[in-house]
Amino acid sequence: MDKKLSNFLEKREHTVLTDIDVITAAVAVPLLEIDGEDHVVFTVRSNKLRRQPGEISFPGGHCEPNDKSSAHAAMRECSEELGIDLDQIELLGNLDCLVSAIGVKLYAVAVRLHTSDLKPNPDEVGEVFTVPLQYLLDMEPTVGHLDIATRPLKDFPFHLLEGYNIDWKIRQNYSVYFYPYKQYTIWGLTGRVLKNFLDIYKDVK
């Protein structure tokens, strides 16, 4: 039996098993030159959307099966959301892959927009605004923290675990970064991506 098991296992590659559904997505951090100064482009999600309506985000979305790479997915979404041709979007390179506490595996890339003639898709984008890059580089974000906790549900077999506590159990916590600008506050996963980009940019600079 060991031989059969060994022959079977040697053909297998590791797969990632998770306790939660993982969504794979990609976003672009777009740079746009305005009056000789670089700005970072943000979108406000349309109120028509089912998920996170009205939230500030970078252009992006789910990675589709026909996307050649996560970078291609991010640029495709950027083109669709901002209403510009793909050839007006230059890939500058990869940032990092962020995994959120709720199971979003997010690949981020930096891009350069070679047109300011943006025609946002109203089905996805309610508003587009820009923030001067230097303003963000000079800012120290406000940092808050959230707990990640678990709680047994009704079908949990307490009878198998004598004395098991039914209360919430805090497992860990994580930092949340807030970047206020005018009437906007950039935070959440978008804030984490922004911080990742700014940290890398400062290292290069």
Predicted feature locations:
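N-terminal leader/linker segments that precede catalytic domains of diphosphate-processing enzymes
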Residues: 1-57, 62-94, 98-107, 112-117, ...
